[in-house]
Swiss-Prot record:
The active site is at residue 73. InterPro entries: ITPase-like_fam (IPR029001), Maf-like (IPR003697). GO terms for cellular component: cytoplasm. This is Nucleoside triphosphate pyrophosphatase. Nucleoside triphosphate pyrophosphatase. May have a dual role in cell division arrest and in preventing the incorporation of modified nucleotides into cellular nucleic acids. It holds the Pfam family Maf. One of its GO terms (biological process) is nucleotide metabolic process. Belongs to the Maf family. Its EC number is 3.6.1.9. Disulfide bonds: none annotated. It catalyses: a ribonucleoside 5'-triphosphate + H2O = a ribonucleoside 5'-phosphate + diphosphate + H(+); a 2'-deoxyribonucleoside 5'-triphosphate + H2O = a 2'-deoxyribonucleoside 5'-phosphate + diphosphate + H(+). GO terms for molecular function: nucleoside triphosphate diphosphatase activity. PANTHER family: BIFUNCTIONAL DTTP/UTP PYROPHOSPHATASE/METHYLTRANSFERASE PROTEIN-RELATED, BIFUNCTIONAL DTTP_UTP PYROPHOSPHATASE_METHYLTRANSFERASE PROTEIN-RELATED.
């Protein structure tokens, strides 16, 4: 694994850092961008994911204009409805009930800002199908607390993985970073 001193990961997600390590990349620094992640009125999930990923990168780029800034955002949606990053048991319960027994879409956008004023963005859509969950399964998952801060109250790399019937698309994207697209962007500037 190589440490890239001029690469900053604009994220507070431990999963994204771990996924980067899977492709042999250790950023020189990790900076948690503090932005308002409110969904705009009538904003579609894909557009929201792209906007938030760009805003995260822009926020950090202002502080480090001479560095490469990697940012990402993952959104879970049912239809056109963006599900929140669950902060309360009530939010988590509502999200899990919505995706129980249904297909839902997960959009992840990855962006790389370069010191040369270039921006590379890729958006990946993955369809995930959950089994129909009993109230006992839902309550058990809620009690685990594994939903906290997770988009759509779901973290498939934890015990929620046992509820997944199928994934059509990128597994790593659902966790938080599409590895193929991230590698493709980074390899234009770094020897990975």
């Amino acid at each position: 694994m190589l440490k890239f001193d001029n690469l900053i990961l604009a994220s507070s997600s431990e999963q994204r850092l771990s996924l980067l390590e899977q492709i042999g990349v250790i950023p020189g620094q990790v900076v948690s961008p503090d932005i308002d992640e409110v969904v705009l009125k009538k904003e579609l999930p894909k557009v929201y994911s792209i906007r938030i990923a760009k805003e995260k990168g822009t926020k950090v780029r202002v502080l480090y204009p001479d560095k490469f800034i990697l940012s990402a955002d993952t959104v879970v949606c049912c239809g056109r409805r963006v599900l929140p990053k669950a902060e309360t048991e009530e939010q988590a319960l509502e999200c899990i009930r919505l995706i129980s027994g249904r297909r839902h879409r997960v959009y992840t956008t990855v962006c790389l800002y370069t010191p040369y004023n270039k921006l590379h963005c890729r958006n990946v859509m993955t369809i995930v199908k959950f089994k129909h969950l009993s109230m006992q399964e839902i309550n058990s998952y809620i009690m685990s607390g594994q939903w906290k801060g997770k988009s759509g109250a779901c973290s498939i790399q934890t015990s929620a993985g046992k509820f997944v019937l199928s994934i059509n698309g990128s597994y790593s994207s659902v966790i938080g970073l599409p590895l193929y697209e991230t590698y493709s962007i980074l390899s234009q500037y770094f020897s990975i």
